[in-house]
Amino acid sequence: MADIRITGRMVNFSRITFDTNDHDVIRQQLSNILNEGSYQGTVVIIDSTVEQELIALIQLLVSLGLQPMAVIDGILGDEARAIQFPVLPADQPLQRIKPTAEQVAIVEKPSSAQASVETKKPLNNNAVAHITSYHDEILRTGQSLVQDQGDIILKAAMNSGSEVIASGNIHIYGTVRGRVIAGAGGHAAARIFCQSLEAELVSIAGTYCVADDIPKHVVKKPVHIYLNEKQELEFEALEL
């Protein structure tokens, strides 16, 4: 019997992009963000648009209760390799497209039950906007549809090499062959619904599953995807 076993495991991680190398600023801003949510022990990927003192940055993140796992290849790639820190491939550039239409719902605080469709009135400090993006056309390879304030409803298929990213739920009325990322920003209650699942990757609130690990019984089937109580992805086949 072999003494070594290789198994797949879904990992919940977050990506942090730095546009500054001022570690005092980074500490202050990250501390404010971390105080607003439950991020203790979160595994993070480091991305940066500027040069960094990588070892010092890693130590800073650890001191804030985060677990740096790797860097995105680019500015920090050579420095990471020099200290034998993992390097992940850089993203392929995608074309961010505009949705066919958007609907904005305004929820007044503290009465979260009262919602109305936004016309042209400016938001006040006591209102929260939830935006639903609708897109009628096929999402082609190299295209990205993003909604960071709500849900996405795609009324067509998506090709391999495309992606859909929403802070809320995602509904796709067609075949899914790209990357589908719901709950971006950590919204664990987000869900994914699609008509035919052949995705390269699905993710909810940082917990992801790649194509090879998607349960076979839901491939090419209508599927509902959500996080269970253990924060694991559940794939529920739908009867349509």
Swiss-Prot record:
Keyword check for ATP-binding = no
Q: Which Pfam families match?
A: MinC_C (PF03775), MinC_N (PF05209)
Q: What biological-process GO terms show up in the record?
A: cell morphogenesis; division septum assembly; regulation of cell division; regulation of cell septum assembly
Looking at the UniProt entry, the stretches that span the membrane are none
Signal peptide from the UniProt entry: none
Q: Does the keyword Cell division apply?
A: yes
The alphabetical list of record keywords is: Cell cycle, Cell division, Septation
Which function does this protein serve?
A: Cell division inhibitor that blocks the formation of polar Z ring septums. Rapidly oscillates between the poles of the cell to destabilize FtsZ filaments that have formed before they mature into polar Z rings. Prevents FtsZ polymerization.
Under the heading HAMAP family, the entry gives: MinC
Q: Which protein, by its recorded name, is this?
A: Probable septum site-determining protein MinC
Species in which this protein is naturally found? Acinetobacter baumannii (strain AYE)
Gene that encodes the chain: minC
